[in-house]
Every structure is written in structure tokens, then in C-alpha cells.
């Protein structure tokens, strides 16, 4: 049985890169906690957008899709799921909402993890949710020729309940010492959870929900306003590379947590940076939405796409962004590069 004692393992994580990321996150947390309290009403739009992006991205990583219109309707609970994909999306939506609303009351214990997994599959007709895997599972990869091979063999089914119990106990024990930064413990826990792979299905989505929950419980609430799952989905190649690197020799307890921990901390830093940028955009005083689009392009040193503008200005509709771009092109304030889906824009500094 794998040993999950974190009391010494965390010390190996204190590389210059990881320490720098920890410092940035602590600084961001200190800067933005006061703003969150003072500007809670202003951030309502970010919360709703983050829910949609989180639900879409985490399911998309696992190949679970629906149309944009159906996704938004499902996340806002304005329709009922019609397909298996939509049932899984609706389940994710509900667990995500539970974490946002009740994170203080959801401890990191096996019974709570099973409850969240049961809710993840509550719209399914078959009885899969809330149960550990009944048979051993493997993690496969496919090469460029389409040949499949085993990348990792998780903990056997018969060991899984005890492994999850031990994992939660050791995490709780390490957290209770007060000497280990939770930002180090959380990705270590998540890596071990993924190596156990406790369920027949839903392990990846559960790992991302647990990441959000644990960040919340540690006082890092950026995931309420910026989708952690969306940032992972955008960098999923790096995610899988770091996961694979950190899981090598896991069963022998000789694995290196550093790649995965560094990746996850980088995601949290990116979330805080994104949050800071969006907050500045939302509270820009005295500017119309079209003027905000212009300011964003002007302050971007290089090219920017329409989708990037919409991501930076989530409260501005596509039509308004397109109208602003059209007006800026007409006035020659910006330059259009390329065409179609590859169109980019850059500020015309010769006009200044």
C-alpha cells in the first residue's frame, strides 16, 4: 500500500520557481481580498461567466460537448438535459454550485468525495455515481499511428477504499500542522488522487472540482471569479505532460511532485493575473464599452483577436465588440491582420 505521508515530501518542492509562484499567489491574495469585499456587486458578471467556462472546459477535456446555447441554458438551469453529454454537464453544474455555495461545510473526507461523485452522476439512469471502481482500471494513451498503450496502472480496485482513506487522513494531518503551505499540499493531493483513480468514470472532472474546493477552503477564492478549469483546458498539453512526469515511479514512492505542483501553481497565478486584468476592465471609470475595447487594444503590445477581447471583457457582448472593431477600423485607429477565423488586430501607433 502506497504511503501518503506529506510531512517530509513537501520540502523537496521548494525550488526557486515554486517559491516564486507561491510568493506571487500570496501577494495577489492580499491585494485582491479587500477589493472582493468592497466590489462584490461589480463582480457578479465574472461569477456567472466563470461557472459557464468551468462547466464547459472541465467536460471538454474529457470529450463531453454540447452547443454553446445549450451549455448556457444548462448552466443557468433553464432547461433539462436531453443527451448523456448534457446529463454529465448538468451534474457538473450542480456539484460546482454546491462547492461555490457550501465549501466551508465540505470536508476533504472519503464520504464527502463519494457524495460529490454521486451528485456528478445524479442525472444518469445507471447506478455509477458515489461508488468506487468495481474493477481495476488503466490509463491508456494513443500514439500517432493510433496504437494504444498503457501509460499508468492505478491502485487496484480492492485497495482503493483504504487508499482514499489514507490519502485524506495524511492530507488532514499535514494541513493540521500549520507549517506546510496548503498551496503545496493541494496539488500533491490531486496528483495522488489521480494516481489512485478511484472511480470507473469521472476521475479527471472530480480532480478539478476537488482542486477548486480545496483552494476555497484554504482561502484562495479566485476560482469563484476566474475558471481554473478553463485555464487548465487551454494548457492541457502541459497539464498531461506534467501529470505524466510526476506520476513516474509513483507506486515505488519515488515520483517527483515538482512538475505537477509547479504547473498547478502556475495555473493559480494565471487565474489571479486574469482576475486582476478583468477587475481593472470592469471598474474602468467614465469609459463606454466601445472605449474600453479601444483601450484594451491600445494597451496590448502586439496582436489581439476578437475572442481574446471578449475574454478580457466578459461583460461586453459579441455584437458590441464587433461594432467597436468596425468603428476603430473605419477611423484607422487599429490595423486588421489576416482574415476569417485567423483575424487579428493591432493598435495603429502611427496615428498617435
Positions of PLM-derived features:
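FIC/Doc superfamily catalytic core
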Residues: 1-352
Amino acid at each position: 500500500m502506497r504511503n501518503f505521508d506529506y510531512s517530509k515530501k513537501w520540502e523537496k518542492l521548494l525550488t526557486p520557481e515554486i517559491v516564486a509562484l507561491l510568493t506571487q499567489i500570496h501577494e495577489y491574495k492580499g491585494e485582491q481580498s479587500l477589493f472582493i469585499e468592497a466590489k462584490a456587486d461589480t463582480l457578479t458578471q465574472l461569477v456567472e461567466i466563470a461557472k459557464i467556462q468551468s462547466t464547459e472546459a472541465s467536460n471538454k477535456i474529457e470529450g463531453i460537448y454540447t452547443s454553446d446555447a445549450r451549455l448556457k441554458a444548462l448552466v443557468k438551469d433553464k432547461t433539462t438535459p436531453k443527451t448523456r453529454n448534457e446529463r454529465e454537464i448538468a451534474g457538473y453544474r450542480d456539484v460546482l454550485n454546491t462547492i461555490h455555495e457550501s465549501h466551508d461545510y465540505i470536508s476533504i473526507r472519503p464520504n464527502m468525495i463519494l457524495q460529490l461523485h454521486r451528485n456528478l452522476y445524479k442525472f444518469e439512469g445507471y447506478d455509477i455515481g458515489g461508488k468506487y471502481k468495481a474493477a481495476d482500471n488503466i490509463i491508456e494513451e494513443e500514439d500517432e499511428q493510433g496504437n494504444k498503450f498503457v501509460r499508468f496502472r492505478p491502485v487496484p480496485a480492492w485497495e482503493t477504499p483504504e487508499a482514499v482513506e489514507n490519502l485524506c487522513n495524511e492530507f488532514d494531518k499535514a494541513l493540521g500542522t500549520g507549517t506546510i503551505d496548503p498551496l503545496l499540499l493541494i496539488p500533491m493531493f490531486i496528483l495522488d488522487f489521480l494516481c489512485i483513480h478511484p472511480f470507473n468514470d469521472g476521475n479527471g472532472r472530480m480532480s478539478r472540482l476537488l482542486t477548486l474546493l480545496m483552494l476555497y477552503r484554504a482561502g484562495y477564492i479566485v476560482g469563484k471569479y476566474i475558471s481554473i478549469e478553463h485555464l487548465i483546458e487551454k494548457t492541457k498539453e502541459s497539464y498531461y505532460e506534467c501529470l505524466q512526469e510526476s506520476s513516474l515511479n509513483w507506486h515505488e514512492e519515488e515520483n517527483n511532485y515538482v512538475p505537477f505542483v509547479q504547473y498547478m501553481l502556475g495555473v493559480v497565478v494565471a487565474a489571479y493575473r486574469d482576475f486582476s486584468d478583468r477587475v481593472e476592465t470592469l471598474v474602468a471609470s467614465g469609459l463606454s464599452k466601445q472605449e474600453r475595447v479601444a483601450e484594451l487594444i491600445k494597451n496590448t503590445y502586439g496582436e489581439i483577436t476578437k475572442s481574446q477581447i471578449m475574454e478580457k471583457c466578459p461583460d461586453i457582448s459579441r455584437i458590441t465588440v464587433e461594432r467597436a472593431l468596425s468603428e476603430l477600423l473605419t477611423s484607422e485607429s487599429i490595423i486588421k491582420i489576416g482574415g476569417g477565423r485567423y483575424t487579428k488586430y493591432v493598435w495603429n501607433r502611427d496615428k498617435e
